[in-house]
């Protein structure tokens, strides 16, 4: 009986070692850039036209998706070779804020709040706390802050808020602020849940989400879910696997031979 147990233990250790070895192999050697095989190295356009890109940062590479070509992946670039891009990469934050200068308010999400706060831009006095009616959250599970994504539409008075535990985006009309609270317009269910871990990933791998409007207001990009939403129809028009495994994203426009970063300050 002891010999059988020792053999079983040895076999278990061997299997565990093999699985660990395979995990390391597949995570470091066999995963292509941007999770797509045969991706070309991105090169700046030379045709003189304006090109708009959704750029996803994944495993040390910048993945360039062409906004005007149905979100097509057109190339990748190691961040180590693109300092001009690396310095513009947004940092992570537990408290997300967006400023609406037209209405003199700041929208904020924070730990422990499944919802969004509206503050007076000048005094920072709290005006409203808007919660997501009909949605709940268990603080012991899921990301905190749970509303880990805020984005103001650049072309209309709309605030988009990511409800990560429920994998839903809540859209609000904010045209009446500061006189009246945000008015709920619609809830958009994501095609993939914001749960589990990003892969490949080296640290802070749990999916928590992010939101980004394109500078022209046509699309919203959802980090850690990968969805691209048409803001006119509020329908999902694409899913980017790189964005499903990253929440770090920004828009890069190539204009007149130079990079521009709309929305970045």
Identify the function of each model-found stretch.
Residues 16-265:
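Predominantly soluble domains enriched in secretory-pathway, periplasmic, or organellar proteins
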Residues 1-18:
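N-terminal Sec-pathway targeting helices
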């Amino acid at each position: 009986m002891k010999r059988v147990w020792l053999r079983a233990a040895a076999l278990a250790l061997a299997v565990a070692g093999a699985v660990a070895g395979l995990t390391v192999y597949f995570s470091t050697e066999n995963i292509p850039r941007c999770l797509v095989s045969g991706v070309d190295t991105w090169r700046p356009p030379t045709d003189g036209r304006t090109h708009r890109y959704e750029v996803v940062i994944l495993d040390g590479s910048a993945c360039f998706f062409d906004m005007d070509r149905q979100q097509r992946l057109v190339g990748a670039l190691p961040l180590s070779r693109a300092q001009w891009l690396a310095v513009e990469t947004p940092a992570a934050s537990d408290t997300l804020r967006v400023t609406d200068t037209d209405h003199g308010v700041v929208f904020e999400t924070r730990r422990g709040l499944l919802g969004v706060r509206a503050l007076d831009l000048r005094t920072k006095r709290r005006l409203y706390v808007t919660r997501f009616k009909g949605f709940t959250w268990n603080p012991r599970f899921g990301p905190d802050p749970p509303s880990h994504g805020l984005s103001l539409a650049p072309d209309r008075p709309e605030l988009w808020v990511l409800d990560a535990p429920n994998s839903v985006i809540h859209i609000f009309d904010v045209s009446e602020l500061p006189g009246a609270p945000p008015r709920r317009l619609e809830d958009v269910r994501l095609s993939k849940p914001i749960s589990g871990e990003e892969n490949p990933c080296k640290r802070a791998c749990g999916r928590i989400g992010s939101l980004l409007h394109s500078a022209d207001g046509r699309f919203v990009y959802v980090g850690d879910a990968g969805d691209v939403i048409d803001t006119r129809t509020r329908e999902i028009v694409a899913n980017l696997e790189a964005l499903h495994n990253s929440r770090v994203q920004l828009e890069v426009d190539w204009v007149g031979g130079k990079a521009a970063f709309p929305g970045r300050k």
